[in-house]
């Protein structure tokens, strides 16, 4: 089956190739005779294929020389499909067509009879692989072996060419004809005119060609150029022949003709030139071959994969084969005088015609209309069956060719004009080319192309007008064609009748062969006035511009491409109307019933003879059926004309695309192709669609597979599903498993760079496959979290500190010395051998002696590096060259210099080793300490007040955020510490005592006070007896004195003050009291007997008593409250609370920090002590002299004793200032192996501890808070009420914005927890039992302060603002004292609180009474103008109301009015008496029955009276009325 290739998007290379081997200097030689010679490039066993070329869409211009010939440049090479000589790329083959498979070509092996080429450069050039095009292209691969084809033996006789013998034709050549270049004409080429005795040898060689595949030489660009140059040189006097040959190649590239069509047209064109015809075999695909003799009258044998056929070039006008003069516009041979020779064309014999009729029946395809994007540049073709005289046919053919050249040049000029116009806008030019290529590839309607071009050139109307010239418009040309056809109709009538008779006689014999060879179909068309020469006399082609746009055709060839998803993009056959008449006899049919081919049997009824005749009369009524499937598109039937009727040119029919609209589908595929962006994936996508069209895939599978390609593009995928009619199935919602939430590890707590702690909600998840061991040992808390970092920077050595960097530099310097010393030593040994050899040489030997590179040794670079190191870089190269060229002179000098350098380098290395050793001793252990160097700066920031408060605040926020459900209990504390070892308390006190003793920041009295404060605080808080603390400190000081060697034990013992046992922390906190005790002790030496308590400031005593008194008088009393308070009392306390402010919290945090660090060191004490005792000297460190004795000399090394005690000793020396930091750190590094780095800042932390302890004494509010702690701590019993009162008292000494902390100590477990307390947090830990919770709530509710656990933002004012008296402010203060809120209150209200629901219930019969008369006010000023105005206004309003139509006075007579007036006067008198009786009420108030209070006292929420009471004045904010509506108060808020 024939395969036509087309590359719609191939871009021609404009780079011109190099000049041909046959240059212009060889053109002046005399042309030798071509008979009996073959050019060097003609190889009988080698061939290439004919690639495609799009003449207009891929090439911008077509240059021709002055003679009309196309220049032999890269354009000519592209016609044969070759890339430019400098390019390694393969020729462009169907890059954007549907055929996207790799194709190979297989040159045939070189036979022994093929003449060798004299041009070695051409024969030895690199291969130029080209795609195989032809019938066998689908069966060929790189590893296929070409089948040998035996060429038949012909007995050739001298033949005439156009009626002339070869001798005569040679004498009639033009005088100015140029000679064949020497590079083209081989000297030893065989003579083709001789008898074919050598043909048998060729056949024998062909049989063995299978074994000679490895000997063939693939062709390249130069071979094709040589052949083109040979054609051009052969027809130098007839440039039209050369141009027609190029046009044939263009037709093949544009898929207008196939490989047999090329063979047929080339054989006809080069008739009489057997060298060119046989040379063309070189470029044919496998299975094709042309064989001809030197006699042009002999038939030409064409070998194809279907078999061997014979083409007779000398046939009758009615036959299939015509002369070149008839086919090509009659280019006759001319003699030297330019006289044309008439062509003698005899009739074709019936035997020859019968052999060709078989093939012609197979190739009766519709006329193919090809288009290269712009105009249809096809000449009206003369039918082959018309016999026109030379004188008459020459002029029309020449005119037609001129028109072709003009039209083609106009198209080229138009494209160049567009490119020049939009030089600065290349996108427009590219878009224009894309429009043309899309028109060819996708068969778009011409209207759509014109619309796109109109939009593109909307700002260039001149270009748009020029483009309209190329649109199809065949009215004028059609008329001329009809007239021309009528002139020659009569002349051809007799020839047609004769040809019809011969064809009918041969028809029946060819029926069976037609069916067998039906599958081999080749498109037949004419181009530039050349018929296809297939025995199908076709009517004249329509004029230029009369072709419809390319549409889908129906051929077996295209149907096969459709199955392979390889539809040619723009080459589709159009329905053609083939003339039917006497000239149709070669098909073996009569005029009465013209049958259709097998591909159109389904359309037989539609194109019946009656309908065909109607279509002849009405050509415009022909409406081809549009269908996208191959084989279903009808082709215009042949026109059944009577022989006497002149065939007419049919009118242009409407394009098939006009009846269908595929714009949306085409747009979808364009978008899909751009979206996929990969040719291979797009091909797979098309294969899936093909499987669905073949019913291999169902709709669900199709959508599922297409989802892989288009699923991420919602628009395309939705359109596709709608187009194929896919309806999504409803999703099944049963058994949906709840997916676990995705956790953002960036928000979790980090441990190092790689681990994150999971929250509690994600840990300990239910797992049925775990046992107790799994729950115990498996990790559910920490997860690995990689750190994403770029690896583009490559590997960098990990150097963690500057000391490790120093070790790196030392090693690099030591390596450099070792490297050059060893290299120099090797070079010295090499040169010593050479110098010793030179000393034994004679003078002549020394002069001629030279050294090779490497100096005769294995290394080629060592001595060069050494010489360049000793000498500078520039002179080093000179020395190396001299050492190679003149070793006798250079070697001794260089050897002496190298020995001198060796001694110098070794001496310097010994000196540097001392420096390196000292540096390594200093930085060796520091380089291993990766945490200690950065810890000192980080620790300073972590122990600041801001950081410590931020730490506990952030922990509280995290705990609150992680509380998932409201029933989840609140966290008890934020920080927890354990103090298992009490001896460390004594160590901390000893370090603090050391610092206080040696510091100069405090005065001596403050130093003593600080020491006592620390001891008494630790004794009181941790429940340690003071005597034990004194004994421990005394023993510590004795150990220190013994170790220091000083005898001051008596002085220490004398300092023991007996009064310290009876002094309390309160005495220390009050400066004046402590100073009095200190002074009396110095005077008497004994404890003073204080007859009265120390004096305090009266304001302080009054404030404390007021707070305590208010706290003890709750606003609610009764059995319920007493029961809750009595059951909440705790006996034998084990848990103590310290409500602290910021200063106390910071002090305690420093204490815990020192304790944790000392505890960590003490826990590893046993192991470190054992290691020190068993530690041996490191051998390599000793050998390298890395061990230093400075620590032992300074007494800082650790011996085999208690390592923890030695750490304390060094710490005291550091605090005293006797030891430098670097030696203290170095000593800890060597003893604890970089694990004691937290003690590097022990002096700084101790200093901060003493600083904050001093703040506890100096800050007045902090001292009061500490006094409250002492008072609570000394109480043996406590209750929830006492703790709440304790908290309220502490809060009274703090500002509203200051933070409060609760430090809780458990005496039994020695555990301390710190909790950050907000305003609405509970004072104590939330009880677990419901009864305990209820009792705690009642206790807090009974106290006058806001109930704990109630958010303050939910509290509201317990009265309405509109009830406030005039002149009284909202906060309860009086603006005017003239108002008197006197009243009577009787309270017998009793309430109950439900333990579970906390609802408030009022008992029946209980009530509250509160009355206050509005007249109980001080008299106002009578002459007040404002008051008078208001009174008069009210009187006037009342009088108007009474006197109105509906008023009370309306129906009263005068007597009634007087009676009412009298009653009014009596009312006034009663009011006056009531005012006089107010004095008596005031006197009884003093006796307790009636009480007078100021309004400010009533509105003060802090003052409360005991309820229930018989008669009292109730404050407004605690007004509990009989309705029990207390929701507006804070109590009601908690109850509800």
Curated annotation (Swiss-Prot):
Gene3D superfamilies: Paired amphipathic helix. GO terms for molecular function: identical protein binding; transcription coactivator activity; transcription corepressor activity. Disulfide bonds: none annotated. InterPro entries: HDAC_interact_dom, PAH, PAH_sf, Sin3-like, Sin3_C. It comes from the Eukaryota. One of its GO terms (biological process) is regulation of DNA-templated DNA replication initiation. Keywords: Activator, Cell cycle, Cell division, Chromatin regulator, Nucleus, Phosphoprotein, Repeat, Repressor, Transcription, Transcription regulation. The modification Phosphoserine is found at residues 137, 316, 1046. One of its GO terms (cellular component) is Rpd3S complex. Residues 166-179, 1484-1495 have a biased composition (Basic and acidic residues). Residues 1093-1108 have a biased composition (Acidic residues). Residues 1-128, 149-216, 308-363, 475-511, 524-556, 1037-1057, 1079-1108, 1475-1536 are annotated as: Disordered. It is found in: Nucleus. It holds the Pfam family Sin3_corepress. Present with 1660 molecules/cell in log phase SD medium. Catalytic component of the RPD3 histone deacetylase complexes RPD3C(L) and RPD3C(S) responsible for the deacetylation of lysine residues on the N-terminal part of the core histones (H2A, H2B, H3 and H4). Histone deacetylation gives a tag for epigenetic repression and plays an important role in transcriptional regulation, cell cycle progression and developmental events. SIN3 also has a RPD3 independent function required for normal longevity. PANTHER family: SIN3A, ISOFORM G, SIN3B-RELATED. This is Transcriptional regulatory protein SIN3.
């Amino acid at each position: 089956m024939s395969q036509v290739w087309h590359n719609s998007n191939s871009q021609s290379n404009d780079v011109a190739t190099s000049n041909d081997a046959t240059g212009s200097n060889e053109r002046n030689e005399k042309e030798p005779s071509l008979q009996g010679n073959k050019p060097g490039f003609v190889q009988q066993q080698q061939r290439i294929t004919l690639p495609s070329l799009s003449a207009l869409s891929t090439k911008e211009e077509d240059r021709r020389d002055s003679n009309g010939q196309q220049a032999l440049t890269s354009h000519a090479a592209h016609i044969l499909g070759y890339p430019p000589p400098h390019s390694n790329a393969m020729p462009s083959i169907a890059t954007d067509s549907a055929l996207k498979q790799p194709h190979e070509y297989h040159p045939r092996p070189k036979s022994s009879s093929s003449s060798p080429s004299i041009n070695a450069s051409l024969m030895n050039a690199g291969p130029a692989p080209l795609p195989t095009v032809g019938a066998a292209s689908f069966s060929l691969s790189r590893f296929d072996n070409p089948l040998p084809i035996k060429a038949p033996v012909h007995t050739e006789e001298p033949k005439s060419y156009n009626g002339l013998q070869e001798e005569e034709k040679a004498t009639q050549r033009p005088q100015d004809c140029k000679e064949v270049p020497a590079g083209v004409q081989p000297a030893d080429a065989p003579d083709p005119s001789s008898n074919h005795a050598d043909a048998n040898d060729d056949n024998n060689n062909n049989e063995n060609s299978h074994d000679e595949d490895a000997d063939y030489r693939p062709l390249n660009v130069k071979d094709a150029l040589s052949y083109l140059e040979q054609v051009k040189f052969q027809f130098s006097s007839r440039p039209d022949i050369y141009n027609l040959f190029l046009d044939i190649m263009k037709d093949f590239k544009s898929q207008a003709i196939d490989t047999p069509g090329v063979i047929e047209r080339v054989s006809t064109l080069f008739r009489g030139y057997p060298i060119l015809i046989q040379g063309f075999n070189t470029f044919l695909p496998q299975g094709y071959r042309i064989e001809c003799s030197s006699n042009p009258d002999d038939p030409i044998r064409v070998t194809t994969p279907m078999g061997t056929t014979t083409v007779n070039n000398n046939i009758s006008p009615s036959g299939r084969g015509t002369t070149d003069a008839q086919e090509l516009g009659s280019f006759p041979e001319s003699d030297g005088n330019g006289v044309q020779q008439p062509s003698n064309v005899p009739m074709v014999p019936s035997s020859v015609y019968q052999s060709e009729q078989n093939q012609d029946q197979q190739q009766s395809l519709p006329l193919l209309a090809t288009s290269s994007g712009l105009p249809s540049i096809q000449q009206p073709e003369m039918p082959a069956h018309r016999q026109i005289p030379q004188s008459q046919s020459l002029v029309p053919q020449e005119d037609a060719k001129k028109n072709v050249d003009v039209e083609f040049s106009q198209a080229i000029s138009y494209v160049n004009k567009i490119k020049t116009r939009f030089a600065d806008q290349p996108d427009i030019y590219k878009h224009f080319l894309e429009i043309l290529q899309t028109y060819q590839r996708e068969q778009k309607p011409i209207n759509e192309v014109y619309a796109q071009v109109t939009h593109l050139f909307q700002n260039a109307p001149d270009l748009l007008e020029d483009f309209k010239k190329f649109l199809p418009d065949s009215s004028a040309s059609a008329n001329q064609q009809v007239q021309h056809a009528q002139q020659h109709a009569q002349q051809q009538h007799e020839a047609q009748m004769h040809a019809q008779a011969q064809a009918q006689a041969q028809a029946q014999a060819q029926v069976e062969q037609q069916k067998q060879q039906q599958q081999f179909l080749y498109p037949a068309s004419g181009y530039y006035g050349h018929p296809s020469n297939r025995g199908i006399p076709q009517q004249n082609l329509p004029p230029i511009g009369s072709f419809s746009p390319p549409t889908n055709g129906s051929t077996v060839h295209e149907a096969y491409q459709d199955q392979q998803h390889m539809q040619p993009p723009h080459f589709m056959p159009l329905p053609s109307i083939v003339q039917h008449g006497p000239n149709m006899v070669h098909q073996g049919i009569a005029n009465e019933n013209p049958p259709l081919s097998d591909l159109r049997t389904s359309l037989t009824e539609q194109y019946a003879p009656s309908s065909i005749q109607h279509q002849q009369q009405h050509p415009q009524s022909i409406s081809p059926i549009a269908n996208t499937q191959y084989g279903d598109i009808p082709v215009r039937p042949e026109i059944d004309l009577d022989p006497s009727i002149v065939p007419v040119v049919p009118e242009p029919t409407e394009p098939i695309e006009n009846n269908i609209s595929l714009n949306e589908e085409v747009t979808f595929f364009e978008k899909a192709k751009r979206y996929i962006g990969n040719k291979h994936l797009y091909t797979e996508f098309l294969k899936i669609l093909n499987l669905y069209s073949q019913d291999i895939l169902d709709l669900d599978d199709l959508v599922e597979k297409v989802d892989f390609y288009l699923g991420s593009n919602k628009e395309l995928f939705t359109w596709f599903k709608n187009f194929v009619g896919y309806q999504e199935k409803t999703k099944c919602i049963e058994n949906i498993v709840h997916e676990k939430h995705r956790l953002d590890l960036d928000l979790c707590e980090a441990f190092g760079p790689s681990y994150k702690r999971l929250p509690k909600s994600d840990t300990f998840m239910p797992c049925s496959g775990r046992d107790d061991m799994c729950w115990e040992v498996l990790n559910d808390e920490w997860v690995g979290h990689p750190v994403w970092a770029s690896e583009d920077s490559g590997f960098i050595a990990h150097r963690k500190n500057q000391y490790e960097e120093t070790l790196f530099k030392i090693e690099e310097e030591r390596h450099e010395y070792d490297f050059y010393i060893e290299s120099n030593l090797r070079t010295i040994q090499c040169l010593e051998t050479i110098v010793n050899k030179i000393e034994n040489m004679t003078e002549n030997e020394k002069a001629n002696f030279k050294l090779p590179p490497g100096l005769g040794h294995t290394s080629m670079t060592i001595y060069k590096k050494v010489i360049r190191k000793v000498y500078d870089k520039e002179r080093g190269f000179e020395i190396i060259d001299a050492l190679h060229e003149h070793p006798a002179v250079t070697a001794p000098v260089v050897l002496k210099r190298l020995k001198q350098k060796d001694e110098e380098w070794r001496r310097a290395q010994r000196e540097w080793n001392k420096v390196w050793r000292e540096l390594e001793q200093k930085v060796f252990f520091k380089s291993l300490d990766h945490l200690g160097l950065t810890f000192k700066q980080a620790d300073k920031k972590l122990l600041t007040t801001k950081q410590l408060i931020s730490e506990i605040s952030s922990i509280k926020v995290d705990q609150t955020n992680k509380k998932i459900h409201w029933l989840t209990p609140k966290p008890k504390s934020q920080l927890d510490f354990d103090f298992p070892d009490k001896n460390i308390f004594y160590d901390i006190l000893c370090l603090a005592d050391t610092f206080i003793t040696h510091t100069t920041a405090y005065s001596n009295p403050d130093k003593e006070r600080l020491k006592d404060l620390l001891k008494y605080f630790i004794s009181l808080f941790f429940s340690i007896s003071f005597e034990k603390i004194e004994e421990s400190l005394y023993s510590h000081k004795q150990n220190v004195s013994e170790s220091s060697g000083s005898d001051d034990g008596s002085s220490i013992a004398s300092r023991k003050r007996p009064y310290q046992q009876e002094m309390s922390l309160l005495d220390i906190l009050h400066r004046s009291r402590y100073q009095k005790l200190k002074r009396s002790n110095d005077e008497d030496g004994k404890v003073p007997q204080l007859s009265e308590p120390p004096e305090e400031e009266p304001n302080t005593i009054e404030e404390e008593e007021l707070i305590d008194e208010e706290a003890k008088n709750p606003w609610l009393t009764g059995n319920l409250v007493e029961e809750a308070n009595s059951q909440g009392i705790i006996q034998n306390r084990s848990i103590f609370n310290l409500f602290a402010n910021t200063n106390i919290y910071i002090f305690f945090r420093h204490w815990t920090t020192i304790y944790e660090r000392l505890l960590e060191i003490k826990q590893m004490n046993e192991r470190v002590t054992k290691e020190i005792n068993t530690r041996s000297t490191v051998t390599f460190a000793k050998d390298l002299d890395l061990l230093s004795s400075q620590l032992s000399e300074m007494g800082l090394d650790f011996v085999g004793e208690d390592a923890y005690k030695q750490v304390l000793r060094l710490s005291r020396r550091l605090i005293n200032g006797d030891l430098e930091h670097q030696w203290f750190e170095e000593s800890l590094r060597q003893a604890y192996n970089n694990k004691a780095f937290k003690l590097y800042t022990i002096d700084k932390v101790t200093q901060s501890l003493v600083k904050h302890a001093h703040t506890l004494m100096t800050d007045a509010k902090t001292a009061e808070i500490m006094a409250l702690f002492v008072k609570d701590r000394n109480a043996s019993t406590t209750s929830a009420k006492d703790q709440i009162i304790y908290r309220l008292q502490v809060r009274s000494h703090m500002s509203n914005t200051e933070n409060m902390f609760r430090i809780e100590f458990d005496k039994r477990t020695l555990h301390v927890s710190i909790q950050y307390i907000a305003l609405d947090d509970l004072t104590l830990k939330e009880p677990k039992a419901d009864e305990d919770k209820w009792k705690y709530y009642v206790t807090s509710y009974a106290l006058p302060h806001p109930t704990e656990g109630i958010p303050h933002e939910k509290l509201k004012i317990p009265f309405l603002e509109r009830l406030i008296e005039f002149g009284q402010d909202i906060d309860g203060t009086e603006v005017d004292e003239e108002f008197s809120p006197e009243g009577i209150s009787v309270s017998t209200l009793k309430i109950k609180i439900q333990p579970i629901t906390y609802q408030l219930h009022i008992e029946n019969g209980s009530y509250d009474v509160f009355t206050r008369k509005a007249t109980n006010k001080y008299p106002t000023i009578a002459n007040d103008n404002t008051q008078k105005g208001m009174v008069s206004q009210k009187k006037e309003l009342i009088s108007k109301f009474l006197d109105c139509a509906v008023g009370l006075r309306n129906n009263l007579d005068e007597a009634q009015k007087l009676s009412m007036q009298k009653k009014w006067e009596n009312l006034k008198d009663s009011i006056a008496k009531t005012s006089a009786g107010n004095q008596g009420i005031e006197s009884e108030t003093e006796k307790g029955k009636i009480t007078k209070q100021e309004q400010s006292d009533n509105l003060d929420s802090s003052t409360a009276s005991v309820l229930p009471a018989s008669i009292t004045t109730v404050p407004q904010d605690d007004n509990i009325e009989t309705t029990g509506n207390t929701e507006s108060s804070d109590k009601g808020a908690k109850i509800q």
